Each structure stands twice: as structure tokens, then as C-alpha cells.
Amino acid sequence: MLPDIGGTELLIIAAVALIVVGPKDLPALLRKVGQFVGRMRGMASEFRASFDEMARQSELDELRREVQAMRSGQFTNPVQDAADAARDVQVDQVFADIDASLSSGAMQAHPYAAGETHNSILPTAEPSAEIVEAKPKRAPRKKAVAEPVAAEPVLVEPVKAPRKRASQKQEITVEAPKAVRAPRKRASKAGDSTASDIVS
């Protein structure tokens, strides 16, 4: 709450207030201090709210002026200004030249592409083929066939039955619960009285 006041300072202030005011009037004083702090916070929030309202009002006034300027035609749209600048005569001339060259059918090759096709100064290398002998493939391995040994006994596992499907009906049996005795009561401690101890 108060970053400049630590725990020891608060204890000292509380001790001084207890000595000066006394234990009898201290609760009333703390109540009045709490009310004063509440009023100060209320005034601060009211000031903040009025300040925010003035800021909103100034923004609304500015927006109203812009809307009035747009209605009267004085407001210039930045997108429209850029479009008007692009309609320059030189830009139109460049586009007209491009359209004329495309429609005439006379196409010029790219200067670098033309140099590659008509370059007779550089010697051309004749393609040469090297003969490489192919390695023979390995023969596939033969699978080893196990010979049955008659002397050793062979363990044969029984074949499991296939699982039943969920769609088949299964009989469900429900057993009745067995009766369970209640736990015995503990013996009472010495000095405790129970209903059986009282004799009328």
C-alpha cells in the first residue's frame, strides 16, 4: 500500500498512536482516518473520471471536424492523391508504348539471351561417353531348410479359440450382495457414561 513505509515503521507509528491517543479513543480515531482515506480515494477517482471525460470529448470534437471537412469536400483522401499522381502523362505514355510493341508482334530477344545463341567465339565441347563395365549381380541366397529331427521331442502349444465379438449376446449374471455385520462398538473409557451405565 505504502511503498516508503516498512513493517518496523508501521509498528512505531502504531505504538506512538497508542500512547498519544490512548487505547480508549484509538478505534474511533482509526475509523475517522479510514473515512478520510475513503473520501480522498473517491475524490481522486472522480478527478480521473472527469479527466477521461474531457479527453473523450476532445477526441469527439476532432472527429466531428473531420466529418464536417469530408462532407464539405475539403478533406483530401491520401489514397485518392496517390491515384491522381499515378495518372501522370509520362506513365500513360510508357503503358501505350508497351501495348504498341505487344500488339505489333515484333519481339526482341533479351540481349543476354541473344549473345548466348550467336556466340561462335567460344569453342564447343563435343560430348564424350565413357564406357563403364557393369558389375555382375550377386546370386540370391538360398533359404536354409530345416531337417526334422526325430530324436528330440517337439513342444506343441494348443491353438487358442478366436475371440468373441461384441455383437454376440453374452449372458450377464448378477449375484446378490452378501450380508455384512456392522462393526462392534468400542468399549467406553473410564469416566464416560453411556445409556447402559445409567440405572433408574
Swiss-Prot record:
The chain crosses the membrane at residues 2-22. Residues 160-200 are annotated as: Disordered. Keywords: Cell inner membrane, Cell membrane, Membrane, Protein transport, Translocation, Transmembrane, Transmembrane helix, Transport. One of its GO terms (cellular component) is TAT protein transport complex. It is found in: Cell inner membrane. InterPro entries: TatA/B/E (IPR003369), TatB (IPR018448). GO terms for molecular function: protein transmembrane transporter activity. Residues 191-200 have a biased composition (Polar residues). GO terms for biological process: protein transport by the Tat complex. The keyword Transmembrane helix applies. It is a single-pass membrane protein. HAMAP family: TatB. The Tat system comprises two distinct complexes: a TatABC complex, containing multiple copies of TatA, TatB and TatC subunits, and a separate TatA complex, containing only TatA subunits. Substrates initially bind to the TatABC complex, which probably triggers association of the separate TatA complex to form the active translocon. Belongs to the TatB family. Part of the twin-arginine translocation (Tat) system that transports large folded proteins containing a characteristic twin-arginine motif in their signal peptide across membranes. Together with TatC, TatB is part of a receptor directly interacting with Tat signal peptides. TatB may form an oligomeric binding site that transiently accommodates folded Tat precursor proteins before their translocation. This is Sec-independent protein translocase protein TatB.
